[in-house]
Amino acid sequence: MQSKKKWFVVFILLAALAGAAFYFLYFIRTPAYALNEARVALQQHDSAKFTRYVDVPSVMDNAFEDIIKAESKINNDNVFSNPFALGILHMLKPSVVDLMTQEALDKIAAKPDNTPKQPADPVPDAMKRNLERHIPIKNLTVKDLKLSKHEGETATATLVLRDKDLEKDFIAELLMQQNDKGDWQIKKVSNLADFIVQLDAAKRAKQALLNKPVMERLNKALQATSERLTLNKDSNKIGSEEKATLTATIMAKNMSNVAINRMYYDVTVLNDKGEQLYSYPEHYQGSIAPGQAVELTTTKKLNSMLPDDKKLMNLDIAKETVKIQVTYIAFDNGEVISPKNFVE
């Protein structure tokens, strides 16, 4: 009888162990397990384990395209509609993605900044740094990470990031897929372009709030009394390429009690809804006495090969309006009014 009880206990233990083993083998092949392991690898600076659960080259490859999409949206400049620019980007992409991947792995491994590195081609390296400036990693901390969806061969994880400077939370959606070895990997940040645009908008909103008193002083110091736009197309046309000259004539008056000797300003073309169509920076060097009005005439060469220029050239410019936004004023007494630029 005791022998039967003994074997029964052994059977129960074996069944429990088998169940635990089955659950373990199943669990290590789930997105939730991969997420946790990626988090642990990041905390432990284990780049080998991290790359098992995060396909870094794939993430960076997708990030390259998404960052350019975001930059185009932020700057209102659709680079994807320019075949020449697009060709250059695709030519540089492999080198830039390789640099971004290696730098990411070095940071995960916590390699010191003074670690000797292979010399990088200056053009891809400069482009890499330009792309990276849109995502201020040093300002972001992980607030939460959880699996939000699992359907068949794909899964989505939600990463909540806190920007300590903006004091605001942002969400990154991580797309996960199972590889040939059965491990789940993060393959891309699905909403990276929108993430960057939202981050940029939050930076600009904070910048506008902090700079509001300065901008009010700038606008009070110099006021536009009249504006006029003209657009003259060049008669010489080369193939499909057209050129034109945009001229903005603005009468501006010094409303302060000190002479202005230098200023920078943006010339902006607006439609009838007040939406920005085109903008370019200009400057003025010369003395404007208190109460004096001066004519600010600026010209901008346009080329139909550039999408924004072509769009402007096709408009009835007489129906559009122009305004200036002063961004810097230097007075004769040495005083300077200039907003701080928080958007990097």
State where each predicted segment sits.
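Surface-exposed, charged secondary-structure patches
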Residues: N75-L166
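Transmembrane signal-anchor/signal-peptide helices with a preference for the extracytoplasmic
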Residues: L17-A38
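Short extracytoplasmic
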Residues: A32, Q43-A70
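Asparagine-centered strand-capping/turn motif at beta-strand->loop junctions
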Residues: M251-N257
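N-terminal Sec-pathway targeting helices
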Residues: M1-L17
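Terminal connector regions
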Residues: N219-Q223, Y278-S279, K301-E344
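Low-complexity, intrinsically disordered terminal/linker segments enriched in charged
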Residues: K138-S235, G286-T297, V336-E344
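Short beta-strand and strand-turn-strand segments in soluble, beta-rich domains
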Residues: N139, R262, D272-Y284
